[in-house]
Swiss-Prot record:
Family, per entry: Belongs to the jagunal family.
Phenotype seen when the gene is deleted: Mutants can't increase the size of their oocyte during oogenesis.
UniProt organism field: Drosophila melanogaster
Membrane topology: Multi-pass membrane protein
Protein name as it appears in the record: Protein jagunal
Lineage: Eukaryota, Metazoa, Ecdysozoa, Arthropoda, Hexapoda
Length: 197
């Protein structure tokens, strides 16, 4: 061993450890994608709280709780897809447990659950409000919103709010599926290497 300021051991330049200190590529990919998947789940939770804020008036109505400030907002009643999408947050626990244990099957179930409970409701929302958004996008500047069939909330087209939500939701869930797929691929490659050896 070399001492500080002392002579170097003969036969080495101090770099002989580099080839032994590398982490295998599949482990690097797994670690990177686990971190990114957790960020996506965090953003999914943030979107859930946005949806929960929208659903609060309906939930309070079902519980027979009256809050004047919330009632004054006159939030439109929710559609079924909003509750289905809000329930998609529960799938995050499946994804987190799969990531913690490197479980391929559970991660695949998580991907299917995200597709069914998060992405499909967003597609429904996209199709449901398409006519309003298209009419708003092609509207002449001389025509007032109140003169059209476009559903308006607080002076703005309601469908445009949902399109903004869908835009962010598609990005979050798309990246979630991408990172989950990369994890499944890395874990399968690692188990295939173990079986081969």
């Amino acid at each position: 061993m070399a001492t500080r300021g002392g002579p170097m051991v003969a036969g080495t330049d101090g770099n002989d450890f580099e080839f032994r200190q590398r982490v295998a590529g599949t482990y690097q990919i797994s670690l990177l994608n686990k971190s990114r998947l957790k960020y996506c789940i965090f953003f999914h939770a943030l979107l859930f709280f946005v949806m929960l804020a929208k659903l609060t008036s309906d939930i309070l109505d079902h519980l027979d709780i009256f809050v004047l400030e919330i009632e004054e907002l006159e939030v439109p009643p929710p559609l079924w897809w909003e509750y289905v999408w809000a329930a998609s947050l529960l799938t995050s626990f499946l994804g987190l447990s799969a990531a913690r244990g490197n479980k391929v099957r559970e991660m695949q179930k998580y991907m299917v659950a995200i597709l069914l409970f998060a992405i499909l409701p967003l597609f429904y929302c996209f199709a449901y409000y398409f006519s309003d958004v298209w009419e708003f996008a092609t509207l002449d500047k001389s025509v007032e919103l109140d003169e059209t069939d476009i559903f308006v909330w607080r002076g703005y087209p309601y469908g445009v709010f949902w399109y903004a939500f869908c835009f962010v939701g598609f990005q979050v869930h798309g990246f979630t599926l991408y990172f989950a797929y990369n994890l499944v691929k890395a874990w399968k490659a690692r188990t295939a290497t173990r079986k081969f050896q």
